[in-house]
Swiss-Prot record:
The gene is rpmC. It comes from the Bacteria. This is Large ribosomal subunit protein uL29. Transmembrane segments: none annotated. GO terms for biological process: translation. Disulfide bonds: none annotated. It comes from Alteromonas mediterranea (strain DSM 17117 / CIP 110805 / LMG 28347 / Deep ecotype). The keyword Ribonucleoprotein applies. The lineage of its organism: Bacteria, Pseudomonadati, Pseudomonadota, Gammaproteobacteria, Alteromonadales. Gene3D superfamilies: 6.10.140.1970. The keyword Ribosomal protein applies.
Length: 63
């Protein structure tokens, strides 16, 4: 997910995306804890996507 794609979305869409990413992060953490997660780089990708969404939300709130 690129920041340019996120900038085109509305605040409601970004909030929905954030909720989905947080759920995905929770599921990945549970899989990692139980040893079922093979691709551990997914955790980092999701965490960075969450940061991207939060950054865009903050920018839109300030504007």
């Amino acid at each position: 997910m690129k920041a340019t794609e996120l900038k085109d979305k509305s605040v409601e869409e970004l909030n929905a995306e954030l909720i989905n990413l947080l759920r995905e992060q929770f599921n990945l953490r549970m899989q990692h804890t139980t040893g079922q997660l093979e691709k551990t780089d997914q955790l980092r990708k999701v965490r960075r996507n969450i940061a991207r969404v939060k950054t865009i939300l903050t920018q839109k709130a300030d504007a």
